[in-house]
């Protein structure tokens, strides 16, 4: 039996994933009972004498471990949320990471809490708006803690964030932390500054993101361009970057004589160096899931070298995943975690396909007894082999990550394979020259050498930028699928793969058939999603925004703060919305002006009492009525009438609507047939109404 540990880890991760997603549908218990009963019946009745019996036992034992880890994680989250939800507390915390906010002098931050009301505590919280601070700083202030909304709860728990923290008052900097994470965060800042000095803003932001993981200097235009070109994974320090740095740096630094060390000493030294470098990369890049997974594989490989264990990529991958989810089983739901593992599995599959195809070609050539090839023919064949390897691995990695992207509601690019074959080879020289420029920039005496590395890295990054900007302008650069349709397509492709494997269909027949099927599915999905109007509630349950979208345009009815604003921008990004035709600010007392870009703006707080504004945009027609203590917005879209309220509104006659877009405001002045809501806990809702009867989105073809 091969790879029993890998099968054990697959059982653990699979059950953690099932436990995280299925409870939301209310079908977890019957599904689990059916799964375990069916598995035991199949193993006991049909596979007792085959090697699959051992695999089944490993799978069940792994599932038991996954159940234990899931139970301990859920108990930990419930304990924290029951203790602090709804409280205003004094926190002392270390700033783990920051991103830009929408207001001057403010940042969005993730905090690791050290004390709550001067009592020791250990938890992570996210603050949407905090006075300016930097990663590695220790801060103090009074915050209001609350549980994340249902729509963002799973993503927050996957990041290890138990509660949201709203800053109230008393902010103070307590100095710099001395933890390993804080020290590496300051090192990241120094390396990023040394790397970017003397460069243009575009290449500098890309290099800082690729080499040090600092994405704060990356423009929104380049982010969108790389996503459209299918190269967004290049801008995140991932397993590919760790493999290049940990696998190639030592080989380039050691002289040839050292590379030929006899015995096991040389391999142990390299393994130790790679493990230390991987640890440093994990700290510098902020403990991202993809880097943690790759570093875990490097550490396990190094351990295998020291204990004379044979390396196995799949086993290392599985063990790294279990170790990453040991303290937080919800981490398996992180998109970065899933994309990283899917990409590695696809890369390994592509490598196996390349290896088998090369072996088959060599056997065929040996049978024909061809004479020795000339020099130029050998070079041409070597170039063709390298191109085939790049295309095959890129194709397998793209096919492996495609289900994750579409099932998680993210857009994907049709040109990921083209970009991978054309410019992915630039990543290694960019990383090596960028790393050289960053390290040399820390020593002022080495400024000339740093400038040489900097110019080379800047030139290569500029080439990559121009390619991304060019490809992102092609039609179909970003496409988005409905989740249900994406699930059907993924099941169809998985079934075809299984049939091809079972019937031993040749690769040159199976691969084009799969690509043709995937292409037809993409074309059909794109055609079906054209001219479909979607009405969604996003953001905080206390102040949700309304997003009405069709194709690449949208209308936004905004209310709330930074949390809602971030959710709106995430939704626009996932839906590939490029034009906001109208932005209606429903806030009656806004603390600041709304800064999101839009062709037309309406601010309710500037309207006269009982005045009405009507606007007709692409996806919808919106009518807004200002009252003394609130406003009413009526939306006509896709043959339906929607109404949403902000504040309190008293009308002479009730407003008729097909659907109420719910908020904490009491809808006494609205008659409706259905509800779209982010919460089932609003005070005005009937007690018999459960969360299973609610949804937060509506879609219909116009």
Predicted feature locations:
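Hydrophobic core segments of transmembrane alpha-helices in multi-pass, intramembrane catalytic enzymes
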Residues: 7, 33-34, 274, 278, ...
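Alpha-helical transmembrane segments of multipass membrane proteins
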Residues: 17, 276-283, 299-306, 322-330, ...
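OB-fold single-stranded nucleic acid-binding module
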Residues: 97-178
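Aromatic-rich juxtamembrane segments at the membrane interface
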Residues: 162-297, 303
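Transmembrane helix-bundle segments that form internal channels/tunnels in multi-pass membrane proteins
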Residues: 1-79, 88-92, 253-261, 265, ...
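Membrane-interface helix caps and helix-loop-helix hairpins in membrane proteins
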Residues: 21-25, 282-291, 306-311, 327-337, ...
């Amino acid at each position: 039996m091969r790879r029993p540990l890998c099968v054990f880890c697959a059982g653990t991760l699979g059950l953690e994933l099932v436990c995280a997603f299925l409870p939301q549908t209310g079908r977890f218990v019957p599904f689990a009972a059916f799964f375990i009963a069916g598995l035991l019946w199949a193993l006991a009745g049909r596979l007792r004498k085959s090697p699959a019996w051992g695999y089944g036992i490993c799978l069940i034992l792994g599932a038991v471990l996954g159940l234990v880890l899931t139970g301990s994680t859920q108990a930990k989250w419930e304990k924290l949320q029951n203790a602090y939800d709804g409280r205003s507390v004094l926190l002392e915390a270390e700033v783990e990471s920051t991103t830009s906010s929408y207001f001057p002098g403010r940042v969005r931050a993730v905090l690791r809490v050290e004390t709550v009301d001067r009592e020791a505590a250990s938890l992570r919280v996210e603050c949407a708006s905090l006075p300016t601070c930097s990663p590695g700083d220790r801060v103090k202030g009074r915050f209001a803690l609350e549980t994340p909304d249902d729509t963002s709860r799973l993503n927050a728990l996957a990041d290890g964030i138990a509660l949201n923290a709203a800053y109230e008052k008393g902010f103070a900097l307590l100095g710099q932390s001395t933890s390993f994470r804080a020290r590496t965060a300051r090192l990241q800042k120094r390396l990023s500054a040394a790397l970017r000095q003397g460069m243009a803003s575009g290449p500098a932001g890309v290099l800082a993101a690729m080499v040090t993981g600092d994405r704060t200097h990356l423009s929104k235009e380049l982010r969108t361009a790389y996503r459209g070109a299918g190269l967004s994974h290049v801008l995140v320090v991932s397993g590919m970057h760790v493999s290049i740095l940990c696998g190639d740096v030592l080989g380039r630094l050691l002289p040839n004589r050292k590379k030929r060390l006899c015995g096991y000493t040389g391999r142990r030294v390299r393994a130790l160096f790679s493990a230390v470098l991987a640890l440093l990369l994990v700290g510098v890049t902020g403990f991202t899931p993809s880097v943690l997974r790759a570093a875990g594989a490097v550490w396990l490989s190094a351990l295998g070298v020291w204990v004379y264990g044979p390396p196995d990529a799949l086993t290392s991958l599985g063990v790294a995943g279990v170790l990453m989810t040991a303290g937080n089983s919800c981490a398996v739901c992180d998109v970065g975690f899933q994309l990283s593992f899917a990409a590695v599995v696809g890369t390994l599959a592509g490598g196996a396909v390349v290896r088998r195809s090369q072996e088959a070609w060599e056997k065929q050539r040996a049978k024909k007894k061809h004479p020795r090839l000339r020099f130029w023919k050998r070079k041409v064949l070597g170039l063709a082999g390298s191109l085939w390897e790049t295309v095959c691995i890129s194709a397998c990695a793209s096919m492996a990550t495609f289900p994750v992207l579409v099932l998680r509601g993210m857009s994907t690019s049709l040109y990921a394979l083209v970009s991978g074959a054309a410019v992915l080879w630039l990543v290694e020289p960019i990383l090596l020259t960028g790393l050289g420029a960053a390290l040399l920039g820390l020593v002022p005496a080495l400024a000339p050498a740093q400038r040489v590395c900097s110019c080379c890295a800047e030139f290569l990054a500029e080439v990559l930028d121009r390619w991304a900007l060019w490809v992102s302008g092609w039609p179909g650069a970003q496409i988005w699928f409905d989740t249900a349709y994406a699930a059907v397509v993924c099941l169809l492709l998985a079934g075809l793969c299984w049939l091809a494997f079972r019937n031993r269909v040749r690769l040159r027949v199976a691969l084009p058939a799969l690509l043709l099927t995937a292409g037809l599915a993409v074309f059909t999905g794109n055609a079906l999603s054209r001219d479909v109007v979607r009405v969604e509630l996003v953001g905080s349950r206390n102040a949700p925004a309304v997003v009405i979208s069709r194709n690449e345009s949208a209308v936004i009815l905004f209310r709330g703060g930074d949390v809602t604003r971030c959710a709106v921008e995430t939704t626009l990004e996932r839906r590939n919305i490029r034009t906001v035709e109208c932005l209606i600010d429903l806030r009656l007392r806004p603390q600041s002006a709304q800064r999101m870009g839009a062709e037309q703006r309406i601010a309710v707080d500037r309207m006269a009492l009982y005045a009405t504004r009507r606007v007709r945009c692409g996806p919808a027609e919106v009518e807004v009525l200002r009252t003394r203590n609130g406003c009413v917005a009526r939306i006509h879209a896709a043959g339906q009438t929607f109404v949403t309220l902000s504040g309190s509104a008293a009308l002479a006659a009730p407003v008729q609507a097909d659907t109420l877009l719910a908020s904490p405001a009491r809808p006494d002045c609205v008659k409706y047939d259905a509800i779209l809501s982010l919460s089932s806990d609003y005070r005005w809702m009937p007690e018999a109404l459960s969360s299973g009867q609610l949804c937060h989105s509506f879609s219909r073809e116009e």
